[in-house]
Regions:
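Cyclophilin-like peptidyl-prolyl cis-trans isomerases
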Residues: 1-155
Length: 155
C-alpha cells in the first residue's frame, strides 16, 4: 500500500504536500487522514508560528485550545510507543497538551530540526513538496503568543 499524500493549499496561493507514514504512526495517520478527508482543516489558520522552530495549526477555534472533540493515543517513545521519526525540518507531528494522549487535530510542521522533541510527540509525516510555503508561513510577522498578525489560512 502506498503512503497517503496530503496537500495543503494556502489562501495566498502557495501549497505544500506531505507524505504520511502509517507504518510509523498508524493511529495518528488514520486520524489525520480522516480529518483531511472530512475537510476539517479547510479554512483553519496556522495560529502559532515560531521561525526556526515550527508552524502549528489544526485548531478550529484558532486559539490553540480547540480540537475535533476527541483525543487519540500518543504514538511516541515517552508514551511507550516506538516511533523512530525524528523532528527534522519538514516533519509533521501532532501537538498535544501535557497529557500524553491529548492530541486530536492540532499538528505542527517543523521549520527546523528540533531533536529535543524526538520521542515526546507523535511525528507522522514529512513535507515532500512546497517547503517554500512552510517557510513563507514561518516568516509571517507575529504578535502575542506567536500568532501571525496576518492570518495564515488553509483553503
Amino acid at each position: 500500500m502506498k503512503n497517503p499524500i496530503v496537500t495543503f493549499e494556502m489562501e495566498d496561493g502557495t501549497s505544500f504536500r506531505a507524505e504520511l507514514y502509517p507504518e510509523i504512526a498508524p493511529n495518528t495517520v488514520a486520524n489525520f487522514v480522516r480529518l483531511v478527508e472530512s475537510k476539517f482543516y479547510d479554512g483553519l489558520i496556522f495560529h502559532r508560528v515560531i521561525p526556526g522552530f515550527m508552524i502549528q495549526g489544526g485548531d478550529p477555534t484558532g486559539s490553540g485550545m480547540g480540537g475535533p472533540g476527541w483525543h487519540i493515543r500518543g504514538e511516541f517513545r515517552l508514551n511507550g510507543f516506538d516511533n523512530p521519526l525524528k523532528h527534522a525540518r519538514g516533519v509533521l507531528s501532532m501537538a498535544r497538551s501535557m497529557q500524553k494522549d491529548s492530541a486530536g487535530s492540532q499538528f505542527f510542521v517543523m521549520h527546523a530540526d528540533a531533536a529535543h522533541l524526538d520521542g515526546q510527540y507523535a511525528a507522522f509525516g514529512k513535507v515532500i513538496e512546497g517547503m517554500d510555503a512552510v517557510d513563507k508561513v514561518a516568516s509571517a510577522k507575529t504578535g502575542a503568543q506567536d500568532r501571525p498578525v496576518e492570518e495564515q489560512r488553509i483553503l
